[in-house]
């Protein structure tokens, strides 16, 4: 209930304590295990490049194939969904993203999340959002919860971590 209240206050997101909140030893554990739970041998997982190592390692352990989505400075380090080949998008099982991003520090605007949800729904892709750095932003930027956006709960899972924010 404490996490539920925190998400409501911080992100204006309503979560069900019975079906939408799970406490883990850490978000890294969750990121690794979600790939084991959802991916089969040969599934394609879309990951940002560069990215935190567990984004690749979890799916690799599950036997999935990786497709790297470049995060380029010219696009403010936002993934360009139209750059993902259609044949890859159609075969992809899961996409892992992280905003605010590690290692670039980039944040994503509302339009990015809306496009992400539309893209994932169109291609039946499960979105995994790592929002561990949502409270470590600068220059007036704001870390957001992917779950705030309409349709996100239908296609995605979000991992958060208090250890980054509170130095635990």
Regions found by a protein language model. Give the residues of each.
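Active-site PLP attachment segment
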Residues: 147-168
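N-terminal small-domain helix-loop-helix segment of the aminotransferase-like
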Residues: 1-26, 33
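A short helix->loop->beta-strand "cap" motif at the edges of active sites that frequently abuts
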Residues: 43, 64, 122-126, 153-154
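Short acidic capping loops at alpha-helix termini that bridge into adjacent secondary structure
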Residues: 14-21, 41-44, 91, 153-156
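Conserved PLP-anchoring active-site segment centered on the Schiff-base-forming lysine
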Residues: 37-59
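Conserved coil-to-alpha-helix start sites within the AMP-binding
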Residues: 27-31, 51-55, 166
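Active-site phosphate-binding strand-loop segment of PLP-dependent enzymes
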Residues: 72-144
């Amino acid at each position: 209930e404490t996490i539920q209240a925190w998400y409501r206050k911080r992100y204006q997101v309503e979560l069900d304590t019975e079906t939408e909140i799970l406490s883990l030893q850490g978000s890294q554990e969750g990121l690794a295990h979600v790939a084991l739970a959802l991916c089969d041998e040969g599934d394609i997982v879309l990951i940002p490049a560069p990215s935190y190592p567990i984004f690749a390692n979890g799916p690799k352990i599950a036997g999935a194939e990786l497709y790297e989505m470049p995060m380029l400075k010219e696009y403010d380090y936002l993934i360009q969904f139209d750059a993902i080949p259609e044949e890859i998008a159609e075969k992809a099982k899961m996409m892992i993203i992280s905003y605010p991003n590690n290692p670039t520090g980039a944040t994503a605007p509302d339009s990015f999340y809306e496009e992400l949800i539309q893209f994932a729904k169109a291609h039946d892709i499960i979105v995994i959002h790592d929002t561990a750095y949502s409270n470590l932003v600068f220059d007036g930027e704001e870390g957001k919860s992917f779950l705030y956006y309409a349709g996100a709960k239908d296609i995605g899972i979000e991992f958060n971590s208090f250890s980054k924010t509170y130095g635990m």
